[in-house]
Amino acid sequence: MCRLLVDDGYIVTGTTRKPERVEALASLGVRPVVVDVFDSDLLRSAVVAAKPDVVVHQLTDLPPGLDPKLMPEARARNARLREIGTRNLVSAATAAHAKHFVAQSIAFAYAPGAMPYDEAAPLNVATADEAAALTARAVASLEQQVLDGPFIATVLRYGRLYGPGTGFETPQGGGPVHVDAAADAARRAIRLERPGVFNVAEEDGTVCGASARAALDWNPAFRIG
């Protein structure tokens, strides 16, 4: 996504928790900032200093390839990131008077029901599966916090990511999306300033991505290069 935005002429400030990732961000033409999203004061200062028109929330904390042995702890970390991290980032964006907020969500937290799932389908917050409920409740919290913010709010429910850097070279499970196409959806959301919630996934009968295709002129076949 950073590469697409820089190529489009945007001035991009990218955050990372780890100083060793600064060089990689800079190589993409991004202005790197080292900050922990859980440090609300430092985060607010960093975002205000960047003077953003748009804040893009792509924060996750998951192991490479979604290693099953590491996923129980990762789910808890990711849920905390979606809840508290989102709260801090929304607060920082508000303090910076950002015009638009784009947030990454997921298109695989729906409650079992008729498929393909569209954006009106309920999330799986009431399931007896503790792991699934933890994820769904955190997703619901993230989305509601963003939608309640004082800015144009766009929530992109990504399908199951595959492609370079994801740990999966081919689609895994229902409702996949290539990482390049996901990045392009974010770019289009930024450019078009479309508010709302959009499924961003390939059509395989699991998830309906018609809203993103119509509102964002998005094509799941998009690839960089």
Feature locations, PLM:
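Conserved C-terminal active-site "lid" loop/helix of NAD(P)H-dependent oxidoreductases
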Residues: 22, 197, 202-225
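Conserved beta-loop-beta element that borders a ligand/cofactor-binding pocket
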Residues: 100, 104-108, 128-130, 139-164
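N-terminal Rossmann NAD(P)H-binding glycine-rich loop of SDR-like oxidoreductase domains
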Residues: 1-11
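NAD(P)H-binding glycine-rich loop region in Rossmannoid oxidoreductase-like domains
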Residues: 17-26, 30-84
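Conserved Rossmann-fold NAD(P)-dependent oxidoreductase catalytic core, especially the SDR/UDP-sugar
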Residues: 66-130
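Alpha-helical substrate-binding/gating segment
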Residues: 161-165, 172-198, 202-203
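Conserved beta-strand positions in the Rossmann-like core of class I SAM-dependent methyltransferases
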Residues: 13, 33, 154
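Residue-level signal for the nucleotide or nucleotide-sugar donor/cofactor binding architecture
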Residues: 38, 81-84, 133, 137, ...
